């Protein structure tokens, strides 16, 4: 089992150095900045309109909570999309690229089972996707909380479902990457 963890650690490090990860991080940070600024201005406009239309504090508070919940769900939906795209892009050329370049031959000649190689890559990418999802979802939730004081119910359940969705896409990507070239893998996964 030790070779699996070594390969997972090496896969994690390798993926962190790839340009696609840098692009994903820049895209994620850009999204968080735009979401925070947009949410601030939308929230200010909604509060002005709610105060004018609803003199009752109770009704205004309920409407405000519903609106905050809706915008937070929209932000988390975008996080889910970015996580799934990252899962598909990270694994698309992993095994196919190593097979084409011949680097996989130096790994599998060692006394390591092929299933350990694939499992190690899967665990490395799973850890990276989990970290990416936590950073992105944490940014959305923190942005909404700092501006409104609102925290959603069942956040852990929702994030775990987003993570499982990303893991399924990553698993399909690694499966296709072991049998097809990188371009075909990307086409299959994004076609799903």
Residue ranges and their predicted role:
Residues 33-89, 118-186:
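Secretory targeting signals
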Residues 1-25:
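Aromatic- and glycine-rich beta-strand/loop motifs that create alpha-glucan
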Residues 14, 97, 110, 141-145, ...:
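Transmembrane helix-loop junction
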Residues 17, 100, 113, 180-181:
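A helix-boundary/kink motif common to multi-pass secondary transporters
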Residues 21-29, 182-192:
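Pore- or pathway-lining transmembrane helices of multi-pass membrane proteins that form conduits
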Residues 93-126:
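Helix-loop-helix units of permease transmembrane domains in multi-pass membrane transporters
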């Amino acid at each position: 089992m030790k070779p699996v963890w070594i390969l997972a650690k090496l896969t994690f490090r390798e993926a962190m150095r790839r340009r696609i990860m840098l692009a994903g991080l820049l895209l994620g940070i850009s999204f968080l900045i735009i979401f925070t600024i947009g949410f601030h201005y939308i929230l200010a406009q909604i509060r002005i309109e709610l105060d004018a239309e609803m003199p009752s504090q109770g009704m205004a508070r309920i409407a405000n909570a519903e609106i905050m919940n809706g915008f937070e769900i929209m932000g988390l939906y975008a996080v889910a999309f970015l996580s799934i795209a990252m899962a598909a892009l990270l694994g698309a050329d992993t095994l196919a690229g190593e097979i084409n370049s011949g680097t996989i031959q130096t790994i599998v000649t060692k006394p390591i089972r092929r299933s350990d190689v694939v499992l190690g890559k899967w665990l490395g990418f799973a850890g990276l996707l989990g970290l990416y999802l936590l950073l992105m979802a944490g940014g959305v939730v923190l942005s909404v909380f700092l501006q409104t004081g609102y925290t959603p119910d069942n956040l852990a359940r929702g994030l775990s479902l987003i993570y499982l969705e990303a893991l399924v896409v990553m698993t399909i990507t690694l499966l296709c990457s072991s049998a097809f070239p990188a371009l075909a893998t990307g086409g299959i996964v994004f076609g799903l």
